């Protein structure tokens, strides 16, 4: 069995925990979808997290991905990290163990200051990164802003490596 560790990183309120919840639900790990705003998200277990509606401590969950060709499955450890700048040290600690990262960007809010910081940290730690534009179903969402930003930053980052 292959094993991968994938971290979800983003500016606060970009939807990391909700994305993790959806992935776990679709993989059959969860029987019901929880919600951060309902205080029943699977990965936000601490009472402070539930009261504030934000992730404070990095959490892990494991799901199994079947192989497309029916050979070897992949065990995926998903790390949901804090997005609030006050807890960025907790997110940075997780970078050392990641095989890949998913940088979540809100389609309604676009790239935020902490998104920039995370992008630079991911480059410094040389973590291969996917960008996921979230909240595209909400009014005011515009994928063009985060996508064009990501394209520009990817070229800048590769030029410095």
Question: What are these regions, as identified by a protein language model?
Answer:
Residues 8, 132-139:
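Conserved short loop/turn motifs at secondary-structure junctions
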Residues 112-113, 138-144:
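Switch/connector loops and helix/strand junctions flanking conserved nucleotide-binding motifs
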Residues 101-104, 126-134, 153:
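Conserved beta-strand/loop subsegment of P-loop NTPase cores
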Residues 150-157:
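Conserved small/polar residues in nucleotide/adenosyl-binding loops
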Residues 146-148:
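Acidic, proline/serine/threonine- and glycine-rich low-complexity intrinsically disordered segments
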Residues 1-105, 109-111:
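P-loop NTPase switch module centered on the Walker A-proximal segment
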Residues 112-124:
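Amphipathic helical hotspot of TIR/SEFIR-family domains
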Residues 159-161:
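N-terminal low-complexity segments that are often proline-rich with Ser/Thr-Pro
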């Amino acid at each position: 069995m292959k094993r991968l560790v994938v971290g979800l990183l983003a500016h606060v309120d970009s939807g990391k925990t909700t994305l993790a919840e959806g992935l776990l639900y679709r993989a059959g790990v969860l029987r019901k979808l929880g919600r951060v705003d309902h205080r029943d998200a699977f990965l936000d277990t601490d009472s402070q997290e539930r009261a504030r509606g934000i992730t404070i401590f990095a959490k892990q969950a494991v799901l199994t991905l079947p192989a497309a060709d029916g050979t070897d499955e992949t065990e995926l450890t998903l790390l949901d990290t804090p997005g609030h700048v006050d807890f960025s040290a907790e997110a940075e600690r997780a970078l050392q163990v990641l095989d890949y990262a998913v940088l979540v960007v809100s389609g309604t809010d676009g790239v935020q200051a902490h998104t920039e910081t995370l992008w630079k940290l991911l480059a410094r730690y040389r973590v291969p990164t996917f960008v996921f534009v979230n909240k595209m179903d909400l009014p005011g969402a515009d994928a063009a802003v985060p996508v064009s930003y990501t394209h520009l930053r990817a070229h800048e980052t590769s030029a410095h490596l």
